[in-house]
Amino acid sequence: MRGRGNARSSQALGVSWCPATWHPRLDMGRLHRPRSSTSYRNLPHLFLFFLFVGPFSCLGSYSRATELLYSLNEGLPAGVLIGSLAEDLRLLPRSAGRPDPQSQLPERTGAEWNPPLSFSLASRGLSGQYVTLDNRSGELHTSAQEIDREALCVEGGGGTAWSGSVSISSSPSDSCLLLLDVLVLPQEYFRFVKVKIAIRDINDNAPQFPVSQISVWVPENAPVNTRLAIEHPAVDPDVGINGVQTYRLLDYHGMFTLDVEENENGERTPYLIVMGALDRETQDQYVSIIIAEDGGSPPLLGSATLTIGISDINDNCPLFTDSQINVTVYGNATVGTPIAAVQAVDKDLGTNAQITYSYSQKVPQASKDLFHLDENTGVIKLFSKIGGSVLESHKLTILANGPGCIPAVITALVSIIKVIFRPPEIVPRYIANEIDGVVYLKELEPVNTPIAFFTIRDPEGKYKVNCYLDGEGPFRLSPYKPYNNEYLLETTKPMDYELQQFYEVAVVAWNSEGFHVKRVIKVQLLDDNDNAPIFLQPLIELTIEENNSPNAFLTKLYATDADSEERGQVSYFLGPDAPSYFSLDSVTGILTVSTQLDREEKEKYRYTVRAVDCGKPPRESVATVALTVLDKNDNSPRFINKDFSFFVPENFPGYGEIGVISVTDADAGRNGWVALSVVNQSDIFVIDTGKGMLRAKVSLDREQQSSYTLWVEAVDGGEPALSSTAKITILLLDINDNPPLVLFPQSNMSYLLVLPSTLPGSPVTEVYAVDKDTGMNAVIAYSIIGRRGPRPESFRIDPKTGNITLEEALLQTDYGLHRLLVKVSDHGYPEPLHSTVMVNLFVNDTVSNESYIESLLRKEPEINIEEKEPQISIEPTHRKVESVSCMPTLVALSVISLGSITLVTGMGIYICLRKGEKHPREDENLEVQIPLKGKIDLHMRERKPMDISNI
């Protein structure tokens, strides 16, 4: 899938056009200008001008070619707007906007002119592949065929490939053009437009090396700062900053570094720079990973294995380990018998390590004739039969010659023992595989594996011969019965190639005359695949931060195998339990992860990796990778609800627990630590960060405010910190904490004149009270609890409305002051609250002496309190509480509270309006307003208004 990270707006970023000389018929922008009255007067002249120059201008228009340039990113989806030819050619005013493709372009309308234009490609060609042209609006869009800049414009193409009306132009620079020829019709507005669309490159290709293994040879005598070009540099089809920008080594070994040089064409070549002195004899090879990185955002990487070989120079000469050897030769030795061998060592390689052996010029010719020196192997053999005149001692000076070196010198002192009798003979018969005197054994051969039979005999047949095994090694030489003088050489314990690869022992025989003979046996062990690869650590513990970049490096696995050659070559593989997005390079052991890891999705990964050698059969070992994804602060605190609602009874004590605000943060450690705070209303509410408990600092009164809306912010402890908010709604539930407030009558000292002619059943006055509570706490009942007067039982009060009516016809004896003590009680639970008010009714025809009435009102009445509950048809609310959930009741009370507030407000407005309509008349009841005192005080002297008190 092609990346679209750099895709920008569909609007073309650059537009340039080159029109010919302006002509009134072709410049549509001029036709939209408002005409003045003068232009109408010049119409005849303008008509003649058009008639004369029109044909020439038409011919001129065919010769005009307009060029437009647009640019867009490669890889855009279908339907992205590239540009509008009509607007960019100024065939339509830009303020007019784009025409509706379904609508007909208007003809001449008054002073404006919109020509019916059409747009088409000169020929189809490849146009349907990459762009589409709207024939009416002239809008260019991308087609369903995705534009791939790397496929269209091959670097270095240098030219233009035409196909019909669409062509591809590329050059060694990073420009890539899509060329189109567009015709604008009808003929009288004809234009031939060349459209160039520059395709901008996006970083959709990673650098890639042509080969996975790159080898560089460096002479071991290369001085510091030697620069060596690395062949096969990485290739990136992208251009510009998206191409290869830099190279780096994953492991420098302290000996090398990389530099990048750029040539005139912008090509970057990596150079290997020597940083220290090299010695092939110390280390002949360095292996590292070379990484190529482009300049995109984010950058893409490519890698290959870089093997740096150290080539040999002739900086070492042959050396002998000893300066002198002593050799004994018996006079009866057979011609051609090797008597000794010298060997020098040269640490160089190839021709630099070739050694030839020769005698020094000081060696006498007689010694040279008696002993032959092989110039290639250094073996000294008896060249002629030892005669009686041969010297008993010879000094052989041998030179080891290397190219360009001073010869190394060793001296062989040869002593000749002249004998009359022949020494014992040792005749071997090999059972194991023997080549050129070397026996080859597999390391896994069992104990007591036979190697060879040896026959020990005296050539003269006169002397007894004994033998033994000389040398160290897991071998045993024992007589092989029932045969005499037959001996078997066999192994005594298992052999391990990894501990010792080569053994040298000798079978020594001697007779009773003291003659000794030995036969050297060389044993070379052959390696078996008996060792499995071993990881340095059986448990590989790794860490990586979440939201890592793709193909992030985790570690480089390393396992050793003690076996040799291909049996010791190790390849690395992921175990079957490893997730698919982990990758392991089988050669280098580099472990990477191809995708971003999310700690909140999975924090720990545990899977196996295998190290397998190339033996037959292969052996393997397993290690466990334990990867821990480290946390980043990439998650905001999250409330369990977006909105929280709490129902709290009013008068709730300060710092009481209202409710718990639950919030979580998927991050870990400090990134997941959340602090809560109240954003608004912080002067009233506070929240406990540790528990998330919301508390009110003060007691809440529903009558002052029935609900609160506040916002709580949760902030984590990351850097930078992340936050989120939640809405908290607190609804106060009403409790019966307000007694009814009597609004009328306004004073215990007020009275009302009742005419004796008032008919029974007629309303006389009313008691009106309100309660600030809601629900049943605000339902008011009225009752008369005390009476005083001539016949005060003549009046009754409606328990629901508080209306006081006349029960019986008034008699002559009923004249005077009637005093009714009215109790106004709510239906609160568990304890109803109430207030009282004194209603004074003066029965008389007129009020002739107000001072007399006032004196009566000042006297404290002797009233017997009647504790009668008013009988009103209200459903009982204070029933026995059942063990059910309180939530439905709380919700219902909240609804009733809100409704009651609305009802009380409406009633207050109604009373105010009603009082405004009342006008006192002479024939109506006379009401005298007397100040109210806190308690029932009939001896008031001051007319100071006060509230009615609770009893």
From Swiss-Prot:
Position of the signal peptide: 1-60
InterPro entries for this protein: Cadherin-like_dom, Cadherin-like_sf, Cadherin_CS, Protocadherin/Cadherin-CA
Main location: membrane
Domain (Cadherin): residue spans on this chain: 64-209, 210-320, 321-535, 536-639, 640-742, 746-863
Gene Ontology molecular function: any one: calcium ion binding
Superkingdom, taxonomy of origin: Eukaryota
Role noted for this protein: Potential calcium-dependent cell-adhesion protein.
Extracellular side: 61-890
This protein's record includes keyword Iron-sulfur: no
Biological process annotations from GO: cell adhesion; homophilic cell adhesion via plasma membrane adhesion molecules
Residue stretches in coiled coil: none
Keyword match Nucleotide-binding: no
Segments crossing the lipid bilayer: 891-911
Subcellular location(s) of the protein: Cell membrane
PROSITE patterns with a match to the protein in the record: CADHERIN_1 (PS00232), CADHERIN_2 (PS50268)
Sites carrying sugar chains: 135, 326, 332, 680, 748, 803, 844, 849
Pfam families: Cadherin (PF00028)
Protein's UniProt name: Protocadherin-20
Bilayer topology: Single-pass type I membrane protein
Any single Gene Ontology cellular-component annotation: plasma membrane
Cytoplasmic side: 912-951
Entry keywords, A to Z: Calcium, Cell adhesion, Cell membrane, Glycoprotein, Membrane, Repeat, Signal, Transmembrane, Transmembrane helix
